[in-house]
Amino acid sequence: MNVSTPGFQRCATENEMIGRTAFLFQSNVYTNNIIAIITWTLTVVVLRKLYTKSIFPNSTLVLLVASLAVGSIHEFLYGFIQNWSLLRSLVYWDQPCKIMFNEYECYPFYTANIFIRLLMICTNCAITIDRLITLSNVGIKSTAQRGIVLFILSILVSVGVCMYMTSDGPNDNLQSNCFQRQGRNIDELTTQIMIYLYIIAICLSLNTIGWFISWRNLKKDKFNLAVQMSKQESINSSLVVTWYLVSQIIFLGLYSILIYAVIKLKDVIGPLLVTNVVLWCYTYTYACMFLPIIILTSTKIISLQRREKINGLTKENQNENQKSYFDKLDRSWSQGYGNRYAPNVPAPVVCINSS
C-alpha cells in the first residue's frame, strides 16, 4: 500500500490548470467519443450478421461475441473516465482546488480499466486456444460450452493479474483524470506495457502455427467433402483471428513505442503537454474499433469464397448432368436408330427334302 506523500498539494498548479483546460485534451475526448460511437454501431451490425449467418464454429462464435462485448465495455468505461474529466475541467475551469482528481476517488475506475484491458488480451488468447483445440483434432466438436468455459478462464486470469498489478493501492497524489496515475515509476509502466505485448505476441505465434497446420492438412483427403469443409472452416476462423491479433499487435505496439518516445522526449515536449500527449498515444480505442471492422471484412470475404465454391460445384454438377443426359440420349438414339432403320434382310429359307 502506498503511503501518503508529505506536504502533497490538493490544488492544481498553474501548468496543470493549463493542461486541464487545453484544447489538446478536449479534442482528444471528442475524438474518442466518435470512435466509441462507431465501435458500438459496427458491433450491432456484426452481431446481427453473426446471428443470421453461420460462418464460425460455435465455440469461436461465443468467444468473438464476448470479445465484441469486452471491446464495447472498454469504450464505455474509457469514455466515462474521460468525459468525467472533461466535465470537471469545464465546470471548474477557474477553480484549481476542484478541477483535479485524487487516487482514492479514481482507484475503482483505474482498476476497472486495467482489468478490461487484460480481459481484451486474455479473450484473444482464449480464441487462439480454441482454434488450437480444433486444429489438433478436427473430429472434436466445437460447442458453445467450450467457448463459455474458455471465456470464464480468461476472466479469472484477468482478475488475478489485475489484482497483482494494482496491489499497491491508491495514494494521495493528484491526477488530471482517472485513466493514468501520476508519479508512477517509469520502469513499472514499461514492464506493464511489455507484458501486454508478450502475451499477444505468443497468441499470434500460436495462431499462425495453427493456421499453417490447418492449411497443410487441407491438402490431404481432397475427395472427402465433409473433412474438407471442416478443415476449411478451421482455416477461415484461424485467419480471422490472425488478422485481429495482427491489428492488436500493431495498435498496442504503436502505443508502447509512442509512450517510450514520450518518456525519452518529456523534457522536449514540456510539462504542459506531456499528460495530454499520453492520452493521444492511447490506441486501445482504435483496437476495439477494428475488431468489428475485421469481422465484417473477413465474413464478407468468406461469404464470397463460399459463393464462388458453390457456383463452381453447381456449374460442375450441371455440366456433369448435361453430359450424362446427352450420353444417355445418344445411346438411346443409337439404339432406336438401329432398331428402326436396320436393313430388311429376308430370313433364309430352309428347304427340307423328304425322301
From Swiss-Prot:
It is found in: Membrane. One of its GO terms (molecular function) is G protein-coupled receptor activity. It is a multi-pass membrane protein. Belongs to the nematode receptor-like protein sra family. The gene is sra-34. The keyword Transmembrane helix applies. The keyword Transmembrane applies. InterPro entries: 7TM_GPCR_serpentine_rcpt_Sra, Nematode_rcpt-like_serp_alpha. This is Serpentine receptor class alpha-34.
